[in-house]
Design a protein with these regions (language model features):
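Conserved small-residue-rich beta-alpha loop and adjacent elements
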Residues: 1, 26
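ALDH superfamily catalytic-core signature
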Residues: 3, 31-147
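Short acidic low-complexity segments
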Residues: 8-18, 140-141
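Structured loop/turn residues at beta-strand edges in well-structured enzyme cores
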Residues: 17, 80, 168
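Conserved acidic residues
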Residues: 20, 83, 171-172
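N-terminal Rossmann-like or analogous alpha/beta NTP/dinucleotide-binding catalytic cores
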Residues: 21, 29
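Short beta-strand segments
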Residues: 23-25, 45-46
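Long, low-complexity C-terminal extensions of enzymes
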Residues: 143-173
Length: 173
């Protein structure tokens, strides 16, 4: 925090009182409570957000490595982390996995590895088809939010189809 802002920030316990406006962030569920609690005050309430990547198969290795940074930073927990890929029909994931290998050391983090093992087991026990490189699973799924150590993907026929979908789902991304 910038030092000049210290005098403007107050931490309180209990019920908030004497404030003019609210900025809050949290899950979609938490946002419902914020909206109710702060209904009489001007507010900016941010809900869950997910980031997506639209691939067309012409990406360079360097671009895919950059995508890996966007997937793995903060273990995938940030709102700007890519949790969903849109790929053309018959997309070959070989180049994608080759680029992701640059982040293979992430599996050395115990909590990440536990999430990887758990989510992979849940997916396999549910008979989902997975692509796996021993530290990241990718699963075909229409959802935007994927669990830690996994990325969802969806095939597309045309970029216009993806553009339309992203416009329609703008409140989620």
């Amino acid at each position: 925090i910038q030092p000049e802002l210290n005098s403007k920030i107050t931490f309180v316990e209990g019920k908030l009182e004497g404030f003019d406006a609210v900025i809050a962030t949290g899950s979609n569920n938490t946002a419902r409570y914020f909206e109710y609690y702060f209904k009489d005050k001007p507010s900016i309430i941010r809900k869950n957000r997910n980031s997506v990547a639209v691939l067309d198969g012409t990406e360079t290795h360097e671009e895919l490595v950059g995508l890996g940074e966007d997937i793995f930073r903060y273990f995938g927990l940030g709102c700007r982390n890519v949790s969903k890929l849109f790929v053309p029909k018959d997309y070959n994931f070989e180049a994608f996995f080759k680029a992701m290998f640059e982040y293979s050391e992430i599996i050395q983090y115990e909590k990440y590895a536990n999430n990887y093992d758990y989510n992979k087991a849940v997916f396999l026990m549910s008979n989902f088809q997975l692509l796996d490189n021993e530290f990241l699973t990718i699963k075909e799924d229409t959802s935007y939010s994927s669990p830690i150590s996994s990325v969802f993907y969806e095939f597309y026929d045309s970029l216009e189809e993806v553009k339309s979908r992203l416009i329609n789902d703008a409140d989620q991304i």
